[in-house]
UniProtKB/Swiss-Prot annotation:
GO terms under cellular component: ribonucleoprotein complex; ribosome
Organism listed in the record: Persephonella marina (strain DSM 14350 / EX-H1)
Protein's job: Binds directly to 23S ribosomal RNA and is necessary for the in vitro assembly process of the 50S ribosomal subunit. It is not involved in the protein synthesizing functions of that subunit.
PANTHER family, alphabetized: 39S RIBOSOMAL PROTEIN L20
Family of the protein in this entry: Belongs to the bacterial ribosomal protein bL20 family.
InterPro entries: Ribosomal_bL20, RIBOSOMAL_L20_CS, Ribosomal_protein_bL20_C
Keywords in alphabetical order: Ribonucleoprotein, Ribosomal protein, RNA-binding, rRNA-binding
GO molecular function: rRNA binding; structural constituent of ribosome
Entry protein name: Large ribosomal subunit protein bL20
GO annotation (BP), single: translation
Amino acid sequence: MRVKGPSSKKHKKKILKLAKGYYGAKHRSFRRAKEQVLRSLQYEYRDRRLRKREFRRLWIQRINAAARLNGLSYSQFMHGLKLAGIDLNRKMLADIAVADPETFTKLAEKAKEAISQKSAA
């Protein structure tokens, strides 16, 4: 005869612990809890990847808004920085745009200079 004792109990206890805080039967019933925990883990996996995309979009929006206050579009600003040899990633640029607008204005001026020098040459 097959004994399902300790390991079965341990497995169920683990699932119900992961389901703590869920609404209704999803934290009481093992079957419902298991379904919800599996779904939650899928969401967690998917959203770890989506988070990276969403933050990049947010940084680009912030940089674009700050660049437009300085008379440049996002693409012109980024191109100007590349021509000027300024190598800052989007996260850093977005932080500068929010926390230190004066520095961002100086970066925008450098980008404008680099663009005008390239077009003059």
